[in-house]
């Protein structure tokens, strides 16, 4: 099996129905409000630094809470779910819809039959690293010609 670092430098292509590495991913029993939802997950990729990853996730009928300890953008691939957000708003999302959950958010999920999503998960950098990254970017821009100039600076990438 390839390591995360190997995967980061080797492109990967998956067909919609090429899912063979599903593992059980039970909804925390304390979060289940109704029914007996059965969830599975399949890891697809991770960034070299481990801060970002993608997964297929699916779940059968049930109602449960979900708490996000990282940023997650999800794309509904199949089925539908009604999401009730902590501010009281509700939204029914279906295949093709995209939802973003920032770290620290939560939602009540009501899955009528089945849901399958593609999840893009990202762990935010600590504040001091964001500041350092931004400083490096500013330094790199110092040597660049303005975009309209077309000449490119000595630090252009």
Regions found by a protein language model. Name each.
Residues 87-103:
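Short acidic-glycine-tyrosine-enriched beta hairpin
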Residues 95, 103-128:
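Ligand-binding loop in jelly-roll beta-barrel domains
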Residues 66, 83, 117-120:
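Short hydrophobic/aromatic-rich beta-strand segments that constitute the beta-sheet cores
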Residues 127-157:
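Acidic/histidine-enriched, glycine/proline-rich intrinsically disordered or flexible terminal extensions
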Residues 59, 68-83:
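Short, conserved beta-strand element in jelly-roll/cupin
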Residues 43, 50-68:
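Conserved short histidine dyad/triad with adjacent acidic residue
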Residues 1-50, 152-157:
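A short, N-terminal "cap"/entry segment at the start of jelly-roll beta-barrel domains
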């Amino acid at each position: 099996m390839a390591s995360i670092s190997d995967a980061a430098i080797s492109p990967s292509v998956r067909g919609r129905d090429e899912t063979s590495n599903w593992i059980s991913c039970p909804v925390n029993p304390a979060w289940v409000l109704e029914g007996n939802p059965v969830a599975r997950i399949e890891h697809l990729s991770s960034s070299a630094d481990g801060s970002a990853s993608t997964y297929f996730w699916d779940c059968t009928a049930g109602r449960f809470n979900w708490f996000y300890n990282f940023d997650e953008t999800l794309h509904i691939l199949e089925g539908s779910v009604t999401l009730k957000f902590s501010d009281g708003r509700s939204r029914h999302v279906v295949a093709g819809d995209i939802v973003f959950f920032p770290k620290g958010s939560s939602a009540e999920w009501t899955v009528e039959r089945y849901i399958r999503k593609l999840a893009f998960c990202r762990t935010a950098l600590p504040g001091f690293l964001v500041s350092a990254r931004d400083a490096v970017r500013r330094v790199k821009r110092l040597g660049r010609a303005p975009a309209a100039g077309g000449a490119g600076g000595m630090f252009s990438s």
